[in-house]
């Protein structure tokens, strides 16, 4: 399935997708046909995902996790994910980032540091870090919806978000 296909999602107002960057403000309201329960899915690009409400049980490269509000996942390209179950109030936000999207950075920095390595990171955020992540997310969301898409601004904001994550 091609995420650039406009018809793969019923409510496109909850997502913004280019060939090297995607952002989803409401995974559940988007009503996607990309993921199904108990269907493994191989990620082509790195992902920044965080839970906003509810709870989900999923496997990432055969390791099971339970994510709830405030949990952030940094997923490496080529990871295999499978959703097992989620509560009816589960909601998450997500960004998908191709490695080419962040080539302007030094290899040891930002996304390469987190997602470019072949590891995944599951990080429970403090309330302060969660609120800051929300602010960064919606600043990026608002920026991609400007009349003119400024890729460099989005790249810098994504970098700032990742630099701000402390663990």
Tell where the protein language model's regions lie, with residue ranges.
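Generic protein-terminus/edge-of-domain signal
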Residues: 1-59, 63-65
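A hydrophobic/aromatic-rich effector-binding and dimerization subdomain
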Residues: 6-17, 83-142
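Tight coil/turn sites that cap or link beta-strands
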Residues: 33-35, 69-70, 78, 100
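A structure-centric signal for secondary-structure junctions around beta-strands
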Residues: 45, 69, 89-91
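Residues immediately flanking
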Residues: 53, 77-79, 97-99
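Short beta-strand His + acidic residue motifs that chelate non-heme Fe in jelly-roll/DSBH
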Residues: 57-59, 75, 81-87
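Short acidic-glycine-tyrosine-enriched beta hairpin
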Residues: 62-76
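An amphipathic alpha-helical interaction segment
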Residues: 128-167
């Amino acid at each position: 399935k091609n995420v650039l296909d406009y018809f793969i999602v019923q409510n496109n107002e909850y997502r913004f997708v280019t060939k090297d960057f995607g952002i989803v403000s409401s995974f559940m309201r988007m009503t996607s046909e990309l993921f199904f329960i108990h269907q493994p899915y191989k990620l082509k690009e790195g992902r920044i995902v965080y839970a906003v409400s509810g709870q989900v049980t999923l496997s990432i490269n055969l390791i099971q996790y339970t994510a709830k509000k405030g949990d952030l996942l940094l997923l490496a390209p080529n990871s295999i994910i499978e959703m097992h179950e989620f509560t009816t109030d589960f909601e998450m936000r997500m960004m998908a980032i191709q490695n080419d999207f962040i080539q302007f950075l030094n290899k040891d920095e930002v996304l390469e540091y987190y997602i470019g390595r072949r590891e995944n990171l599951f990080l429970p955020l403090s309330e302060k870090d969660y609120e800051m992540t929300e602010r960064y997310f919606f600043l990026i969301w608002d920026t991609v919806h400007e009349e003119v898409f400024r890729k460099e601004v989005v790249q810098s904001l994504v970098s700032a978000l990742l630099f701000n994550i402390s663990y």
